[in-house]
Design a protein with these regions (language model features):
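Transmembrane-helix motifs of polytopic, lipid-linked glycan transferases
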Residues: 63-71, 173-196, 230
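Start-transfer (signal-anchor) and selected internal transmembrane alpha helices
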Residues: 1-18, 43-112, 292-294
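Membrane-lumen/periplasm interface segments of specific transmembrane helices
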Residues: 20-34, 275, 279-361
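Specific aromatic-rich, kink-prone transmembrane helix
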Residues: 188, 226-244, 248, 411, ...
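Hydrophobic, aromatic-rich transmembrane alpha-helices
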Residues: 64-69, 345-374, 387-392, 414-415
Length: 444
């Protein structure tokens, strides 16, 4: 065993110890103080060993990706790889969701009391609903919004309102929308990686993006949909600055503007966007007008929502009040500030822990000869990690971060491209995801 491999294993073991500590300390706090408001800390889940109709498919997808994923990713034509990655990610997410059954795993996820579909009827007049949106954020106001609606800007809810308007009504359609769009997130990351760090590393990352344990929570979670929108904004930004494309710049700005109106916390994606610009700054030097196209696209959604009567900043301040009115004001910051990182270790898996060790090595001076592709990938991953840490320190995400931080987790997974001999690491990722899905009943 080489020294480098031993260090990779140490990193994976450190992540496992962090998760173990979060479980043991969390159980003690919950049993003695009852302040965590989760049944299986640090995850928002219940212990419920079970099998389901998705079990055979999940095992088959996992076995296929572990056995053939690296070789197929290396040989397929680029566009074929993108299509295969999306199809495989979709199959993995759906099969894991169906372990819980169609109703419990997909169709019922977005219809519970705190979810978006419960308020569709209150948006029969969309302009009026937007003008009145901030009046129902704080608890104690007339007809306060359920937690997820109050906790997000209105574009999140409007997505499902518009699906309903075009005839795609109910939890089944909403769940499959989130899964289908969410599965494209890995494609966006691959496109960005190829533009910034080269095709070889993108191909090595592909199986890990497909077989991520995060898929357990991507199944019918709106945050999986948010993650994909944010990822495409970065992919288009990478194409804009490397290809000097005004169209891609405008589209990137448009999607980042939408991202900010899907989730307040995803404004932190600006940090990852800054890393993209730094890595391809030559494109902006040659065509500084790309900034104007980016800003023009970025302005669209803020202008539309502001003119419609929704004040983003005012809504965010009201959300902070609402957050501390509820369990967010009771959950102990001293536990969650590190237990949230344990949740991230769970959804990204042991391979990512080992990969993050290698990204650190790639950035440290004096750690060996610099390779530009590896350094570019490491900078991108580090920017995502920094954004996640800022979100953690803010205290606005205490618990449920295995779902809430899916958008950031998606950009940590490329670190796995730096690992040699990918199959054992892929197997570890798959086993973790299968155990999580079959031993726990996850919720949000």
């Amino acid at each position: 065993m080489t020294r480098s491999l031993r260090r990779d294993l140490y990193a994976a073991c450190a992540a496992a110890l962090l998760v173990t500590a979060a479980v043991l300390v969390g159980r003690h706090i919950q049993d003695t103080r009852h302040t965590l408001f989760v049944h299986w800390p640090p995850l928002f889940a219940d212990w419920d060993p079970h099998l389901g109709p998705g079990t055979p498919a999940a095992l088959a997808v996992a076995a296929a990706v572990v056995a053939y994923g690296p070789a197929v990713a290396a040989r397929l034509p680029w566009r074929g790889l993108l299509a295969a990655a999306w199809a495989s990610a979709l199959a993995w997410i759906v099969s894991l969701a169906l372990v819980d059954g169609w109703r419990r795993g997909i169709a019922g996820r977005l219809t519970t009391r705190n979810e978006y579909l419960r308020v569709i009827g209150r948006f029969h007049d969309i302009p009026a609903a937007l003008r009145d949106f901030t009046h129902h954020i704080v608890s104690g106001t007339p007809d306060p919004w359920p937690a997820h609606i109050a906790g997000h800007p209105p574009a999140a809810t409007l997505t499902f309102v518009l699906l309903d308007r075009i005839g795609l009504r109910g939890g089944g359609w909403a769940g499959m929308w989130c899964i289908t769009v969410g599965a494209t997130g890995c494609v966006a990351v691959l496109i960005a990686l190829r533009a910034l760090a080269g095709e070889a590393l993108a191909r090595r990352a592909a199986p890990f993006l497909v077989l991520a344990p995060a898929a357990v929570w991507q199944g019918a979670s709106a945050d999986g949909y948010f993650a994909a929108v944010a990822a495409w904004s970065l992919a288009l930004l990478a194409l804009a600055v490397t290809r000097r494309s005004h169209g891609c710049a405008a589209a990137s700005g448009l999607l980042f503007g939408l991202t900010c109106y899907l989730s307040y916390g995803l404004t932190l994606f600006a940090l990852i966007g800054a890393a993209v610009v730094v890595l391809a700054r030559g494109g902006l030097r040659e065509r500084p007008a790309l900034v104007l196209s980016l800003l023009a696209g970025l302005a669209v959604f803020p202008v539309v929502f502001t003119l419609a009567g929704f004040d983003w900043w005012h809504a965010y301040h009201l959300l902070v009040t609402r957050y501390y009115q509820g369990v967010g004001g009771t959950r102990p910051y001293g536990y969650w500030v590190w237990a949230n990182l344990a949740c991230t270790a769970v959804i990204t898996g042991p391979a990512t822990a080992a990969g993050l060790r290698r990204t650190t090595t790639a950035l440290l001076p004096g750690s060996g000869p610099r390779r530009l592709p590896e350094t570019a990938l490491a900078l991108l991953v580090t920017a995502a990690l920094l954004a996640l840490l800022i979100a953690d320190l803010s205290g606005m995400s205490k618990a449920e971060t295995e779902r809430i931080w899916l958008p950031f987790a998606l950009w940590l997974l490329p670190a796995c491209a730096l690992l040699p001999r990918p199959r054992p690491w892929l197997a570890a990722q798959a086993v973790l995801a299968l155990l999580l899905n079959h031993l726990l009943l996850t919720g949000w």
